[in-house]
């Protein structure tokens, strides 16, 4: 899944701002109808809710993640990814700026 760039895509100019600007992303639309978001999360402890299943690919930085229903925290860094079921949530703790790609199923 790791690629250095996405070709032949459209990018929505308006940024997605969440949690008072602690998470900022842009939506990327692919010719086949799929979408991804490219973004950063600044240092914070946040809870995200999902509609569709997501795969979070970490490009830079590290984070701790706890999926809904779990008591265990997992640490992820550059080159790693984690999956979140649809209609669920996850907690994320970021100590340094996290650069990510969110792949929607």
From Swiss-Prot:
<keyword id="KW-0808">Transferase</keyword>
<dbReference type="GO" id="GO:0009032">
    <property type="term" value="F:thymidine phosphorylase activity"/>
</dbReference>
<comment type="function">
    <text>Catalyzes the phosphorolysis of diverse nucleosides, yielding D-ribose 1-phosphate and the respective free bases. Can use uridine, adenosine, guanosine, cytidine, thymidine, inosine and xanthosine as substrates. Also catalyzes the reverse reactions.</text>
</comment>
<dbReference type="GO" id="GO:0005829">
    <property type="term" value="C:cytosol"/>
</dbReference>
<dbReference type="InterPro" id="IPR009664">
    <property type="entry name" value="Ppnp"/>
</dbReference>
<dbReference type="GO" id="GO:0004850">
    <property type="term" value="F:uridine phosphorylase activity"/>
</dbReference>
<dbReference type="InterPro" id="IPR011051">
    <property type="entry name" value="RmlC_Cupin_sf"/>
</dbReference>
<comment type="similarity">
    <text>Belongs to the nucleoside phosphorylase PpnP family.</text>
</comment>
<protein>
    <recommendedName>
        <fullName>Pyrimidine/purine nucleoside phosphorylase</fullName>
        <ecNumber>2.4.2.1</ecNumber>
        <ecNumber>2.4.2.2</ecNumber>
    </recommendedName>
</protein>
<dbReference type="InterPro" id="IPR014710">
    <property type="entry name" value="RmlC-like_jellyroll"/>
</dbReference>
<dbReference type="GO" id="GO:0047975">
    <property type="term" value="F:guanosine phosphorylase activity"/>
</dbReference>
<keyword id="KW-0328">Glycosyltransferase</keyword>
<dbReference type="GO" id="GO:0004731">
    <property type="term" value="F:purine-nucleoside phosphorylase activity"/>
</dbReference>
<dbReference type="Pfam" id="PF06865">
    <property type="entry name" value="Ppnp"/>
</dbReference>
């Amino acid at each position: 899944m790791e690629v250095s760039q996405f070709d032949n895509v459209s990018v929505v100019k308006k940024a997605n701002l969440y949690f008072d600007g602690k998470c900022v992303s842009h939506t990327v639309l692919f010719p086949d109808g799929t979408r991804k978001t490219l973004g950063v999360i600044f240092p914070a402890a946040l809870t995200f809710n999902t509609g569709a299943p997501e795969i979070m690919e970490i490009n830079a930085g590290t984070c701790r993640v706890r999926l809904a229903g779990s008591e265990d925290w997992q640490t992820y860094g550059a080159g790693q990814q984690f999956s979140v079921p649809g209609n669920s949530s996850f907690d994320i703790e970021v100590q340094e700026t996290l650069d990510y790609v969110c792949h929607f199923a």
